[in-house]
Amino acid sequence: MRQGRTYLKTNDQVEVIAGKDKGRVGKVLRVLVDKDKAVVERANMIKRHTKATEMNQQGQIVEKEAPIHVSNLQLICPECTKTGRVGKKVLEDGTKVRYCKSCGESVESKS
């Protein structure tokens, strides 16, 4: 499998399309390009048990997000608010942008 080719970026709005959190919508917190995975806000939550230490007398159970493979995520277009596939194209001025294949609009952040 080809690695390092992902269409997701940090702060993108995505929907989980497969797995235990199917249908959940969240923001991408981190993209792991080398593993083709992304961490999505409040999706794929796991529990980690921490041992008691001298500084932290009690052990505890910590819930945190685990990475999800990018094939199980679909980007939500900010223009048409639908989930869909994303393409990449080069504009006339030479800049590369991602675009929604259903409405044709750019999905890049307006900053």
From Swiss-Prot:
- Sorted UniProt keywords: Ribonucleoprotein, Ribosomal protein, RNA-binding, rRNA-binding
Q: List the disulfide bonds.
A: none
SUPFAM superfamilies in alphabetical order: Translation proteins SH3-like domain
Q: Which residues form a coiled coil?
A: none
Entry keyword annotation includes RNA-binding: yes
Q: Which GO terms describe its molecular function?
A: rRNA binding; structural constituent of ribosome
A GO cellular-component term linked to this record: ribonucleoprotein complex
GO terms for biological process, alphabetical: translation
Q: Which InterPro entries match?
A: KOW, Rib_uL2_dom2, Ribosomal_uL24, Ribosomal_uL24_CS, Ribosomal_uL24_KOW, Translation_prot_SH3-like_sf
Q: Which domain of life is it from?
A: Bacteria
Alphabetized HAMAP family for the sequence: Ribosomal_uL24_B
Name the family the entry cites: Belongs to the universal ribosomal protein uL24 family.
Q: Which NCBIfam families match?
A: rplX_bact
- Assembly information from the UniProt record: Part of the 50S ribosomal subunit.
What's this protein's function?
One of two assembly initiator proteins, it binds directly to the 5'-end of the 23S rRNA, where it nucleates assembly of the 50S subunit. One of the proteins that surrounds the polypeptide exit tunnel on the outside of the subunit.
Name of this chain's protein? Large ribosomal subunit protein uL24
This chain's source organism reads Desulfotalea psychrophila (strain LSv54 / DSM 12343)
